[in-house]
Amino acid sequence: MSNVKTAMDTSNEESQLSYNASTSSSCAAGKEHATTPPITPIGSPTALGMGAFAIAFTTLSMSLMEWRGAAITNAYIGNCFFTAGLGLVLVAQWELVRGNSYGHTVFGGFGLFNLAFGAINAPAFGVADAFKDDPAALSNALGYFLLVWGVFVLFFTIAAMPMNLVYTAMLGTSQITYTLLAASYFAMADEKATAGVGLKKAAGAFGFVSGLLAWYVVAHLMCQDALFFSFPLGDTSRLYARLRRNR
């Protein structure tokens, strides 16, 4: 029974949105100098964060693809402010308490994006009204906004590569979503409506894939905690550790 528990603990650590390799060596080096006091285990917020991300991304992506004619994204302002905005920011703080800087940065970054995107789309903030005489300027501004966030998510993707394939694919497809959506707004600003709609739908398709991958991670984490099995994530940590040693 103890062997099963050890295996489960190891698998659980590998599925978290964090790095463990960098801290293990420093802990080993300091073990002979000081004894670390026992730490009470803290629950992981990763499943909640992944669920919030999945809900926000899949619903928004369905609107971007205009499924059943749902092309107006303002319907998801609640998701932006609360589910994926406030929710992910709170998850990020819990990751910080657990000492997970990468998880804190990723969840916090997506949370801040959703809060900002919700404010842009909420009529109470008057963003659209400020550009009512120049809609092309609004489209250009939104294009720049999404393009810069796409750069941030690109860094998330690169940093996820030494973890596993699912996180890398999830973040990579979300980065493509930001880039294509930015291109869509730029096309709209240039009055290329057909190209703009096509790019928007393509962004929705990549966003939908990203959301499905997040749902996959949620299922993995839930089954890992509650049942006797989990889903493969395509661990890449051993490969990258071997590459580092061979440098």
From Swiss-Prot:
The keyword Nucleus belongs to this UniProt entry's keyword annotation: no
Membrane topology: Multi-pass membrane protein
Disulfide bonds: none
GO cellular component: endoplasmic reticulum membrane; plasma membrane
UniProt keyword annotations, A-Z: Endoplasmic reticulum, Glycoprotein, Ion transport, Membrane, Transmembrane, Transmembrane helix, Transport
One example of a Gene Ontology biological process annotation: patulin biosynthetic process
Superkingdom field: Eukaryota
Glycosylated residues, chain numbering: 20
Intracellular or extracellular location(s): Endoplasmic reticulum membrane
Pathway(s): Mycotoxin biosynthesis; patulin biosynthesis
Usage in biotechnology: Patulin was originally used as an antibiotic and specifically trialed to be used against the common cold, but it is no longer used for that purpose since it has been shown to induce immunological, neurological and gastrointestinal effects. Genotoxic effects of patulin with dose-dependent increase in DNA strand breaks in brain, liver and kidneys have been detected in mice. However, more recently, it has been proposed that patulin might also have anti-tumor properties.
GO molecular function: acetate transmembrane transporter activity
UniProt xrefs under Pfam families: Gpr1_Fun34_YaaH (PF01184)
Transmembrane segments: 37-57, 71-91, 106-126, 141-161, 169-189, 202-222
Family in the record: Belongs to the acetate uptake transporter (AceTr) (TC 2.A.96) family.
Job of this protein: Acetate transporter protein; part of the gene cluster that mediates the biosynthesis of patulin, an acetate-derived tetraketide mycotoxin produced by several fungal species that shows antimicrobial properties against several bacteria. May be involved in the uptake of acetate, a substrate for the synthesis of 6-methylsalicylic acid by the polyketide synthase patK.
Protein name: Acetate transporter protein patA
